[in-house]
Amino acid sequence: MSESNIPESVSYSDSHEWIQVESDIATIGITDFAQSELGNIVFVELPEIGEYAKRGETFGTVEAVKTVEDLIAPISGEVLEANETLEEDAKQINEDPYGAGWMIKIRIEDEEQIEELLSSSEYADIINE
């Protein structure tokens, strides 16, 4: 059973991204479970401002010591901001995945996609299977 931190204040995707909604802006990152499975994260590649993130498709990559994983957009929208501090200090993803380790902010295109995300308890069920 996992001892991951699963805040109730955010929603989740089954590909281990979290999403926090404020008005029409969504902040996205990877979950505590994902960062712990990856191990020490050494590099992250994020999209440029103005690019389009499409739900279910890759918006970037995260590189750990022994693996590289795609980052999958949990919803669609225009990228408004990318966390550039991660380029110099990717370990923030390991240290604070729901805070300083956030990855991108996008303008929400379709609010119905938010409804389809997982709650904290639904996400916990997935990672504890």
Question: What is each model feature region?
Answer:
Residues 32-34, 66, 75:
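Short glycine-rich, polar/acidic loop-and-turn segments at beta strand-coil junctions
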Residues 1-58, 91, 95-129:
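Acidic, low-complexity mobile loops and tails
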Residues 11, 45, 63, 69-73:
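Small beta-strand-rich domains/subdomains or short beta-sheet motifs embedded
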Residues 35-36, 49, 78-79, 85-86:
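Short, charged/polar surface micro-motifs in flexible loops or helix N-caps
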Residues 64, 84, 108:
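Short, conserved catalytic or interaction motifs in soluble domains
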Residues 56, 62-63, 82:
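Residue-level recognition of conserved beta-strand edge/terminus positions
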Residues 16, 62, 71, 76-79:
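Conserved hydrophobic positions within beta-strands
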Residues 76, 80, 87-94:
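Charged, amphipathic alpha-helical coiled-coil/dimerization segments
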